[in-house]
Each structure stands twice: as C-alpha cells, then as structure tokens.
Amino acid sequence: MEDVQNSPAQVAMPIDRVGVKNLQLPLVVSDRAQGRQHTVATVDIGVDLPAHFKGTHMSRFVEALENWTEELDYASMKRLLEDVKTRLEARKAYVLFRFPYFIRKKAPATGSPGLVCYQCRLTGELEEGRPSFLLEVEVPVMTVCPCSKAISDEGAHSQRAVVRIAVRMTRFSWLEEFIDLAEVSGSSPVYTLLKREDEKFVTEDAFAHPTFVEDVVRAAAQRLERHPQISWFRVEVESFESIHCHNAFASIERTITPETQPGS
C-alpha cells in the first residue's frame, strides 16, 4: 500500500511537534500512603517532523502507549519517550499526562475521612538522549484577608484559592510533598467532609492565620527553594475573591543553583 505520510511535503517546513491529543488511558501512579494509586490520565504525545515528510504516523503513538503498561515515574516515562522517538524515527519526543490524584484527608476535629482531588500534570521531553521532566499540581486552600480582618469590627472576607506549583527536579519526589507544602502556605487547608466541630476549627484556624495571595506565594516559594531535589520552580496563587468581581493572583519563578540554595 502507498505510504502517503512519507511522500514529499508540498511546503518544505519542519514541524516542531505533531501527534495525538486527549487520549484517555488508565494510569498507575506512586502513592505515599498506599504504595500505588489507580487513576485515569488524559495523554498528549508527539514528536518533531522533518521538512521533507508530508505527515507523521499517528497510529504509532497509540501503539507506543498500548505497549507501555508501567507505573508512572521518571524512569518509565523516559522509556516511553525513547520508544516513541524510535518508532517515529524522530529527533525529539514529547508526552504529557494529565490526571486527578486523590488523598484521603481526615477532618481536623472529628477525624472524619474524605477524599480530596488534586489535578496533576507530568510532562516529559527527550532530545539528543537527554530527558527533562516537569511536574505540576494544583492545590486548593483557604485564605482570609488580613486587611479586611484589621479594619472590620466583626469578621473578614474569606475565600478559596488555588496554589499552582510547577517544578523541575533532579530526582523523584512524592506528589504529597508539594501538596503539603502548598496547604501549609495558606490560611487553612480545605476538606471534603466537615462536621460542625470541624467547621468551627477550620474557621477559627483560618482567621488566626490571615494571608494575602502575596503571603501565600512567598511562603510556598520559600519552601520550594529549600527542597533538595528542585532545580527550577514556578508557583502561582490565584484567589477567587468573595467580595470582588475579579480574582487576585501572585507568582514567583526561580532557577535553583548551588549558589542560590538557602544556607549556601
């Protein structure tokens, strides 16, 4: 049969990335408490394409994923990237896994358990044999406005916010490390199941620790700077303001070197 993909391109221009998007697959990820967690991932996968080829071989991306049945970590992701690069005879390979990750959290007063969902992304790229990985996680928190608390006779406005962390690491780290780091940076964590005693605890604890988005992003960034496995990070905090018709945000991005490591 004629291989149209390998025929000459009408416009001889190289393509940076071509492949398939939004392919859903079951996924196994490392879980600090349980060892392993089964979830569902939405996958984007692609390669570069030289100027002289009309098209890529889309079926080979799916074949590579079908043959990849490993637990998601850096080593297994590198093997997947190498397989894709070989199958497509490419110089560069790319894969992105988007998946929900669940942690069963106990309410602070009653201990009632409830699952909290965190949206995660792991991106891998391979070029000239060198892999690079980017881990991202979104963590909901609660914030209480310090200004509102200071100027009001009673109460203060509070709202949910999200801490978005992206890191490049030199070795494996648990997702829970970054989730914990984000949650302690806000006024309070948020929970799925709260009884009245828990609501009282969360409200009083949050009002005892009021935070601007600036406070939250600085606290998270300071903790990320101290992480021994991080070479680069970006953290953004977005607050869904309860008394404004807009959101507030703050972000910090840093490259970590031995010279910039705290205590060096």
Swiss-Prot record:
The record marks 145 as: May be catalytically important. GO terms for molecular function: GTP cyclohydrolase I activity. GO terms for biological process: tetrahydrofolate biosynthetic process. The keyword Isomerase does not apply. Pathway: Cofactor biosynthesis; 7,8-dihydroneopterin triphosphate biosynthesis; 7,8-dihydroneopterin triphosphate from GTP: step 1/1. It comes from the Bacteria. It catalyses: GTP + H2O = 7,8-dihydroneopterin 3'-triphosphate + formate + H(+). Pfam families: GCHY-1. Signal peptide: none annotated. The keyword Protein biosynthesis does not apply. Its EC number is 3.5.4.16. Keywords: Hydrolase. Converts GTP to 7,8-dihydroneopterin triphosphate. Belongs to the GTP cyclohydrolase IV family. This is GTP cyclohydrolase FolE2. It comes from Nitratidesulfovibrio vulgaris (strain DP4) (Desulfovibrio vulgaris). The lineage of its organism: Bacteria, Pseudomonadati, Thermodesulfobacteriota, Desulfovibrionia, Desulfovibrionales. The gene is folE2.
